[in-house]
Amino acid sequence: MWANLRVTSAAISGLVASHVGIARALTIESRQGSNTSTISWTTCPDVNSTQCAFFDVPMDYTNPNSGSTVSIFLRRYPATAPADQRLGSLMVNPGGPGGSGSYTIATIGDYISTMVDGRYDIISFDPRAVNLTGPSTACHDSEYKFADRMHQVNMQGAPFPHVGGAGETAHVAKLSAIQSSHHAACVENGNHEMLRNSGTVAVAKDMERIVEALGEDGLNFLGYSYGSILGATFAAIRPNLVKRMILDGVSDAEAYFTDVLEWGRSGVQDTPKAFAGFISTCIDAGPAQCALAVTKDNKTETIESLTKRLDALYTRLGNEPLVIGDSLAGPGIIQAQNLQSVMFSMMYNSGGWSSLARDLVVLEQGNGRDYYPAVSGIVYGTVPEPYTQNVFNRSMQSYPANTRESVYPILCGDSPQSNITVQGYADYFREMGKLSPMGEQLALIAGGCRGWSFRATERYTGPWTVEKGLKKTRFPILFVSLDADPITPLASAVKMSNGFGSESASLLIQQGFGHTSNAHPSLCTLTNLRGYLLDGKVPKNGTYCTPEPGWIYPTNSTASKRSMLSKRDKGLLEVVGKIGRSKVPIGF
């Protein structure tokens, strides 16, 4: 999911100032139609349709006069509508934690702009500890060291399939030791001040500073996945500044801040539904559309037989890993836990299920040459890309390594100290595996906080309900959830929207498979989102939408139906589809 280059803040500052002319000394350029912005924007060197800037904020908001600062890197796709139709800025967070906002705008900023008729400046930023925002957490002084450590985690992986007993505990002990080696590197080498000040509350306060610097009187926000936690935190501490807020793919913010292991449990409630959808849609599509829908002896699969077939592949790889002599990512092996990891990530994007089915058939046949880069690249970002001297291309057009590293200071720093034992960690893996067919993969993330030493300077621990003191927001938040999302279940969206109350929240539910509404496009959902952002129309709580047919497995019939849509609706669905199939990692 993440990519290849880690560049320190000092190096970036020098390169940017000398090579691309983005420096804090630049003359202020205000947003068109406003003369109150105090952010200096200039054309980005990599994607000329976007503008970039640095913006300084206090390192520690509990001690703002300490003199230490964080340099936030921002990027925006300017509004294209006539000046009298513009609505200000729409801030986007792609999730994570640790998602690069600058990469998001560079990659899909124009698509988001099209969704809102060009009436907003589409803006985002690299949160603390992420990409070009500095100073870096600096746990590792080279990309190689971090990549090597991630490779070790990859090869050890979650204990799957479970074998039980001392062998399983020993496996988890080794995995935890590898994860702890990263934590130790942060203790020995890292920027401790930054590691303690990269939490969600600090980023929410950065957003407030950015809004003020833009000269705007409140926040318009679109947050995906972890972005729902960031948005909900902002709404909880600055309810008067919420102008428009869509939280799509809703995570349980209370569990996130209270108990990282419970947050993991809450996240996999609907993973079984997503996996069942992968199986059932394949069977329904048939062999002509889904390569897994036919057996080796040319018989039609059933849901039960296909499920057993995939279980058999896991067992085979668990007993004897597949050896890869060469591939784009080099030689290696594919183990059961590697397959499960990629399967989990592919549950996010139902538009890619037909490709996944083809890959699995090839893997069954003992050919993992083309599949192995997915093990290294999709999950750990180690697929090599052509070298370029342009630092922006190296940092923003691929997903940066320090973004992967930022998961720990954000996720682990936001939660209380995790003192789970090795045996407790092993038990947690087994528990999560029973909750979900791929629960071990989220256990690997949540349990990875074991032994993390740095707590965020500020953490928000509530209230999370009106009854306990949560204040009314200036404008209602729109929560959006698919009913079969593998990582942010519908139950979390119901809990969060109920917590903010009927005066401050409304929930839109969409039938569909994948992570966030972009994963399974719906014209109904899109119409409601546009009405909310463009006209201030809040959908009735509990509004239910269905996806457009033919997204997962297109047919001539569904193509014919789509051709009957208006030019505008076809264009909007096409844009959402591009976001859903983009390389931007939306979510955790």
Map each language-model feature to its residues.
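Second-shell loop/turn segments in exported
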Residues: 193-194, 342-345, 398
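Extended, H/D-rich, highly charged conserved domains that either
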Residues: 380-389, 393, 397-405
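Fungal secretory targeting signals
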Residues: 1-27, 247
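P-loop NTPase catalytic cores that bind/hydrolyze ATP
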Residues: 332-362
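Glycine-rich, aromatic-lined ligand/substrate-binding cores of catalytic
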Residues: 352-355, 366-370, 403, 415
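Short edge-strand/loop segments of extracellular domains
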Residues: 96, 363-366
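Amphipathic alpha-helical substructures
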Residues: 365-382
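Gly/Pro-rich cap/lid or specificity-loop segments adjacent to the active site
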Residues: 28-339, 409-588
